[in-house]
């Protein structure tokens, strides 16, 4: 079984419409859509926005349905200038941009007694990269950073880039999903399409391009499912 997680209705709608033998299950205010996509058994999860929602949803997904792997799909704000709206980021690893326990000797972004970053599964990264190339999308591999703030100001963006110069994109759930998968030893990957440039116009461009980003990220998931 393949677990798929998206934070917003807009980010999972295309995938939900592809599910056959659909069964809707609600646990602790989290919606799960169980069924099949192209004969592959899936559970599509509407996590809600933010790190706590993402961690709760991922934990429920793992404990209730025991997925073999987890795919996180959705949108993100670009931090790297090589990414434009509609482009795709495949996570090699994920960390928090708003965690700071440096006073106790930890790295910025590191939760105490946890890794500095959470590495995506190598095989899933290779598969996602292959799909992006086959679909002739502009895709990049790299670090994605997460925090409980929508990055809609240039000053916020610059602070994150100063602290995490290798970060390619920013959003609000991926690292919580990654940490939960790490703790439960479930392979994962994060694929996000760019909906905005994490700048002063981010809120407007997000609203305008979330549909395009959802389409791109959903296409990657659908193609990956054919090989899982």
From Swiss-Prot:
<dbReference type="InterPro" id="IPR035994">
    <property type="entry name" value="Nucleoside_phosphorylase_sf"/>
</dbReference>
<comment type="similarity">
    <text>Belongs to the PNP/UDP phosphorylase family. MtnN subfamily.</text>
</comment>
<dbReference type="InterPro" id="IPR010049">
    <property type="entry name" value="MTA_SAH_Nsdase"/>
</dbReference>
<dbReference type="InterPro" id="IPR000845">
    <property type="entry name" value="Nucleoside_phosphorylase_d"/>
</dbReference>
<feature type="binding site">
    <location>
        <position position="151"/>
    </location>
    <ligand>
        <name>substrate</name>
    </ligand>
</feature>
<feature type="binding site">
    <location>
        <begin position="172"/>
        <end position="173"/>
    </location>
    <ligand>
        <name>substrate</name>
    </ligand>
</feature>
<dbReference type="Pfam" id="PF01048">
    <property type="entry name" value="PNP_UDP_1"/>
</dbReference>
<dbReference type="GO" id="GO:0008782">
    <property type="term" value="F:adenosylhomocysteine nucleosidase activity"/>
</dbReference>
<dbReference type="GO" id="GO:0009164">
    <property type="term" value="P:nucleoside catabolic process"/>
</dbReference>
<keyword id="KW-0028">Amino-acid biosynthesis</keyword>
<comment type="function">
    <text>Catalyzes the irreversible cleavage of the glycosidic bond in both 5'-methylthioadenosine (MTA) and S-adenosylhomocysteine (SAH/AdoHcy) to adenine and the corresponding thioribose, 5'-methylthioribose and S-ribosylhomocysteine, respectively. Also cleaves 5'-deoxyadenosine, a toxic by-product of radical S-adenosylmethionine (SAM) enzymes, into 5-deoxyribose and adenine.</text>
</comment>
<comment type="pathway">
    <text>Amino-acid biosynthesis; L-methionine biosynthesis via salvage pathway; S-methyl-5-thio-alpha-D-ribose 1-phosphate from S-methyl-5'-thioadenosine (hydrolase route): step 1/2.</text>
</comment>
<feature type="active site" description="Proton donor">
    <location>
        <position position="196"/>
    </location>
</feature>
<dbReference type="GO" id="GO:0019284">
    <property type="term" value="P:L-methionine salvage from S-adenosylmethionine"/>
</dbReference>
<dbReference type="GO" id="GO:0008930">
    <property type="term" value="F:methylthioadenosine nucleosidase activity"/>
</dbReference>
<protein>
    <recommendedName>
        <fullName>5'-methylthioadenosine/S-adenosylhomocysteine nucleosidase</fullName>
        <ecNumber>3.2.2.9</ecNumber>
    </recommendedName>
</protein>
<keyword id="KW-0486">Methionine biosynthesis</keyword>
<feature type="binding site">
    <location>
        <position position="77"/>
    </location>
    <ligand>
        <name>substrate</name>
    </ligand>
</feature>
<dbReference type="GO" id="GO:0005829">
    <property type="term" value="C:cytosol"/>
</dbReference>
<feature type="active site" description="Proton acceptor">
    <location>
        <position position="11"/>
    </location>
</feature>
<dbReference type="GO" id="GO:0019509">
    <property type="term" value="P:L-methionine salvage from methylthioadenosine"/>
</dbReference>
<keyword id="KW-0378">Hydrolase</keyword>
